[in-house]
Amino acid sequence: MPFQDVSAPVRGGILHTARLVHTSDLDQETREGARRMVIEAFEGDFSDADWEHALGGMHAFICHHGALIAHAAVVQRRLLYRDTALRCGYVEAVAVREDWRGQGLATAVMDAVEQVLRGAYQLGALSASDTARGMYLSRGWLPWQGPTSVLQPAGVTRTPEDDEGLFVLPVGLPAGMELDTTAEITCDWRDGDVW
């Protein structure tokens, strides 16, 4: 499976390199191992639909002696902001194995996916857990303060349960666009959690 090295933070004297690989280049064993690790890291609060959302884009992996210890993914979505459908890199499945937490591995996989965001998208977005909010704020991600919605088959529908969890990272907005994080934003439709 082809990997691209992206970042190599040193934590506790150990060098961990985040590697990028597209979903299409993952063999079945690696993909299934990543799914299991992410589900375990989320302590069961991560569904098959959540994993499905993480497929089809780039994955950042950190392995130690062949075992996956950290993961993040970025997939393409469209977010409607005012009259523009922004090309969005949506970050999914950011997870660090429990016995490796607190060593900067989440930072390393985020460095990798943010490199992808800056190279390919107009906007980064993610739905943050309460425990991860501080990390995203420290990296320059902006909490979305306006109303969220989804463009579902029946039309635009508000998603008030997601209003507090959305974060965005402007990386290449169209010329002249100012991002107002108090405005409404709408995501494209998908099964499971839409945000």
Curated annotation (Swiss-Prot):
What PROSITE patterns does UniProt report for this protein, alphabetically? GNAT
Q: Which InterPro entries match?
A: Acyl_CoA_acyltransferase, GNAT_dom
Which residues are recorded as binding CoA? Answer: V94, A95, V96, R101, G102, Q103, G104, L105, A106
Give the top-level enzyme category: transferase
Alphabetically ordered keywords of this record: Acyltransferase, Antibiotic resistance, Transferase
Q: Does the keyword Nucleotide-binding apply?
A: no
Question: Domain N-acetyltransferase spans what residues?
Answer: 21-180
Q: What is its EC number?
A: 2.3.1.-
- Residues binding substrate: D45, E92, A93, S127, E161, D162
BP GO annotations: response to antibiotic
Tell me one Pfam family matched here. Acetyltransf_1
Q: Name one GO molecular function term.
A: acyltransferase activity, transferring groups other than amino-acyl groups
The entry assigns this protein to a family as follows: Belongs to the AAC(2')-I acetyltransferase family.
Function in brief: Confers resistance to gentamicin, tobramycin, dibekacin, netilmicin, and 6'-N-ethylnetilmicin.
Q: How does it assemble?
A: Homodimer.
Question: What's the protein called, per UniProt?
Answer: Aminoglycoside 2'-N-acetyltransferase
